[in-house]
Amino acid sequence: MIRHAFISLLLFAAPAAAADGPSRTFEARDLFSLEAAADTQISPDGSRIAYVRRSGDIMTDRMRPSIWLIDTASGEQAPLVAGPGAHMSPRWSPDGSRLAYISTAEGGAAQLYVRWLESGESVRITGLPTAPSSIAWSPDGRQLAYVMLVPGEAPRLGRAPSRPEGAQWADPLQQISAVMYRADGEGFIRPGFRHLFIVPADGGAPRRLTFGEFHHDGPIDWSADGRNVYLSANRSPDWEREPDNSEIYAVDVASAALRPLTDRRGPDAAPTVSPDGRRIAYLGYDDRGYAYTQTRLYVMDRDGSNRRALTGGFDREVSSPAWAADGNSVYVSFDEGGVTKVARVGLDGSVRTVADGLGGADLDRPYSGGSFSVARDGTLAVTAGSASRPAEVAVVRGGSRRTLTRLNEDILAHKTLGEVRRIETRSSHDQRPIEAWLTLPPGHRDGQRHPLILEIHGGPWAAYGPNFATDNQLYAAAGYAVLSVNPRGSTSYGQEFADLIHRAYPGNDYDDLISAVDAAIAAGVADPERLFVTGGSGGGVLSSWIIGRTNRFRAAAVQKPVINMVSQVLTADATPYFARYWFGAMPWEDHEAYWRRSPLSLAGNIRTPALVIVGAEDNRTPPSEAEQLYTALHLRGVPTALIRVPGASHNLVGRPSQNAARVSAILDWFQRYRNGWQPPQR
């Protein structure tokens, strides 16, 4: 029996076009034309916004980042750095006369540049062997601090004989000794450690300020007098096996002396200095041994004393702290019910929402996210998103939002997009409220049923929201309704909801997902005889788990899954994290727990035709996971196919052509098995 407490359908997108309006639907080629705003940085006086504009390029098959400048009064914008290469991380000087940024304009490693706004001249001020990150201006505008990998020597056991001159020998042996030796999107990690540097803002020799065989990370900030730089680092003796144990450090600019300001078990990061220099706001949490703990906002005196939580009573994760000019409050972003917002947190712990509806950089799926910055007068620059548009640039003053860009009107204004509606139901497991969104085929009429794709988010500690998603729009254009669910464990609903899957994933989230499917059927939208399922990463785990639990779905597309928790923990790039926090025991200590949570344990039940997709260079959910499912299905005699995406990391969607082909393959697979499949009689 299907049980529902209530179903609410609320419209988040524009209504369906009138008969004389645009009739074209979203199509794969449009992926090359989309643009999105990111990293909005408002000038100190609030008059201009620099932002990163990500634009599709059909000739290079990539999203190219460039930097644009907007006048906040007129809305006029112009490219600041938009030539060949990737241009990112614009940061204003304290007086607003210059803009530092990172660019690969000259090829090779990314370098640090400074743009003088009055003259329009840009100067490269570094010639670094590896890319800088986390750039921060000194208070007087004379120096820039940044973090950079300092290459180290690879370990060596033995050596080959001397090579004769002119001989062509094989590459030397590659010896590995690090616990974490691969990183997704990077491959085998280059030997070395990230360290803090400063460099004159008009060019000169960089000076290194941190040392030792530890990584030192941003975001970073300067003390008000310019004598110290604050950063975070995990310098514990067993830092390789204790990934969540970083502290805030003060680095003396003159002597390079390092002084810890925090000393608890847990990750403290993102130090942000108050305007008067007396306090430091930062992010962190007490390590509970859980796979997910909401990050809180803290404040302490500049010497590390009087540490206290400001959001201890606020049951949401916060990020991106930025002080208000009066020093009496701190701005942060947070997610609530899949929607990203900005709040102002007082030193008394009060929390007041000042902006909502932010949009993130993800285009393929409707993840929550977004960025903001704040001017001295409290004006906010945000990336504003919606169900019908990728992120734009907007300003928020006095609670009123004004969108300054229309990056995709040339494409999307002439498209009929699928409407996005909210559904709320209750889980059949324990009657907890479960929130979801339905993307409907263009031209949908009430009472009309459609084949349904259950599309499951990754993480699993993440959240979907009413956000633009190319995957969903392509599915909808093909005639499918798409269901995006936030099952238990999803973020933005509080710590207790997230904890429901601690060492219990996958598990009762299955009931949440199926209850949402039943709600879509009860709403008169989904055809109960034409159900399909897909998802990536954590969604790949759950889509493979679902077809091991039920035969209700005609076909599945399992993307970048984890199938065998033992092999995942021992081959993924975050090995110390998975074993320590997801299980609390090594595979040889509690093999039953690993197997009980492995979708492979249910492979003998699967009768659903399943397409399996994975990036060939995925180091987070390695290809061997997808291959195990593919092989198991073949051995079972269940229809299957394996797609490896060449050059793709866990991200999978870095190249628009591959992204379009991936969605097309999923739609072809679903069409092939639209009537289901029955095993042959033996």
Q: Where would I find each of the regions flagged by the language model?
A:
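Residue-level detector of Asp-centered blade-edge/turn motifs that repeat once per structural unit
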Residues: 44-45, 94-95, 139-140, 224-225, ...
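Hydrophobic beta-strand positions that form the internal "hydrophobic ladder"
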Residues: 49, 96-100, 141-145, 229, ...
